[in-house]
Amino acid sequence: MPSNSPEVPVSMDNDASSQVVQTDSRKIEVNVSIPEDAQTPTYSASSDGSFSPLTPGDGIEASLPLKAGLNSESENAAKVGFKLGSSSIDEDRPFKVVVIGAGYSGIIAGIRFTQRMKNIDLTIYDKNAGVGGTWFSNRYPGIANDVPAHCYQLTFEQKTDWSAFYSPGPEIRVETERIVEKYKLMRYIKLNHELTHAKFDEPSGKWILRLRRPRASSDTASASASDNEPETIEDTADFVLAGVGSLSRWSWPDIEGLKDFKGKILHSASWPTDKSGWWQSSVADWGDKRVGVIGSGSTATQIVPTLQPRVKHLFNYVRGKTWLSPTFLGDRMSGILGHVKTRGKDVFTDEDRNKLKDPEFYKHFRHGLESEMNSMHLVTIRGTDLQKQRQREFKEYMLSRLKKKPWIADYLMPDFSVTCRRLTPGPGYLEALQADNVDFVPKDIKRITETGVELCDGTHHELDVIVCATGYDTSYNYPFSVIGRGGKTLKDRFTPHPETYISLCVDGFPNWFMSMGPNSVFGAGSMLIVMEKQVEYAIQVAKKMQREHIKSIEPKFEAVRDFDEYLEEYFKTTTFTENCRSWYKMGKAEGRVVGLWPGSTLHVVKTFQNPRWEDYNYEFLDSVPGSGKPNRFYWLGDGSTYNEKHLTGDLAWYLRDDEVDIPSVPE
């Protein structure tokens, strides 16, 4: 047999003890013994008289001796078990998509999946009683966005009547509800459904999901106490998009005596509100209260100025340092709106809102703000002129706001660069620290007593209320178990730190994609454009799976490893790896940057535009269910398109104006 003779694929049935291949008038009998529960291997026949497994990447070399040579007629044996598909190439197979979370990622998914895919079964689960994600669950006093309101919008939505430059949290929550109603998404959303367990079923290529939900109320008076316990349900999915984000898990700070306090103790992430969802009623009787606020991050810098005029006395306990920035893009906003300077509270007037009702003016306003915001990337790179300039500006700004108590600057103003931590506008925070009824306390807390806070120097503050504004669990240790191939858990895979393929997916966890997962956030700027692009990327993957009858898709280990190496090298050039405590580094001063995307906003948009399909491993569905004989071209179907087979629709659609790409003629 010539040495360059082609390999001939041969498949062997589990229930067969031999496979006969006829070639060059000779017959080859291959004796094989395969256990009934074993996976059916697919082999290639080589010219050296051996069979080798076709499946690459498992690192296993195997061969079976042949009793004779081969010839081209063995192709017939290779196709044993293949059955031509009966569907047209453009008939999409039924496809089940489950989205976890009804925040902005889930809302975008609800809009785009149904817009861009056909024949799908979509369900969006959320543990909360309403939509909005972090904007539903976070309701603390003063909650607001930290980027301009008109930049924190979906690209295809135009809200012109925001009340303030930094949109209040309740307004954002109402906006998410409006979008859900506009696009009729509640038919896909199931509230009060909390994911507790997800496991990938390898034979079927589906995720098996367990969720906890309230048990349906009983109509009988004799219902037992167990009837009020939550019930567990199961669902399955061909494709999962987890949009849980990093601001959905919180815990109490590790301070001695926290449970001993006899007064009221609150966490910013679990603030009690009335039915309207606004926080004002919860602090209505605090006028005679002594309140302690623990923290100086973005949450604390919103709570302190909000509570200061509403309480008798306020103590702000601060452990670390942080930069407080001027109004982000405030000068740009003022210039477009025609103001001489940014107003103190940055609220929009009726005149402003009337201007913004004009579609062309609104487009100019929003485009100007976002262009300016996207020009700030060099602030995050060490040693750049823009980085040095911003540090000087922030220092001048903070000192100008602390003239009454200038000593605070020594404890609050950092030595690290302005973007080592996420930029904190904190409008009104520095001014609140100057108030006579506020004590800035830059000392460590020793413990909480029954009546207040004891510091390490022995000082004790009597308090009526303690507010813990101590952030979130940003370790990506999700509150539900995710089990991939071979019983591997996502928690184990993310130890000692999360590793992903471009922040979206992980090897060993097929058909599981993430929005706002590890390394997907920015140090400054709006996250919504990222969420949109992550969802759109996930849809491209899901469409490919549906169209090409792919059972599973997952990134190659080498691709995950290479992205991890890129992360390591990129962040060495940035301010993010300086010595500062940040949630980017899971609350540590030094260590791995797990929260941020390695690049700019525009960089991530470009990254997600065109998937690199060569970075993925695939498994295909069997052409005959249960045969164990997948064929990558089964999706070609019966050789027809739907319209020509049924003699319906446009049979020359490629000539439509929206399909023809007319090239320009060179001059």
Which residue stretches match the model-derived regions?
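A conserved short coil-to-beta-strand element within the FAD-binding core of flavoproteins
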Residues: 191-207, 438-456
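Feature captures the FAD/FMN-dependent oxidoreductase FAD-binding
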Residues: 163-248
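C-terminal, flexible cofactor-proximal segment of oxidoreductases
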Residues: 64, 323-326, 354-360, 499-500, ...
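Central helical "cap/lid" subdomain
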Residues: 255-265, 451-503
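Core beta-strand elements of the Rossmann-like FAD/NAD(P) dinucleotide-binding domain
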Residues: 227-239, 286-287, 456-465
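Beta1-alpha1 glycine-rich phosphate/pyrophosphate-binding loop at the start
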Residues: 58-73, 95, 99-100, 104-189, ...
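Rossmann-like dinucleotide-binding core of oxidoreductases
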Residues: 77, 87-94, 98-99, 104-121, ...
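Extreme N-terminal leader/targeting segments of oxidoreductases
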Residues: 2-97, 115-119, 218, 233, ...
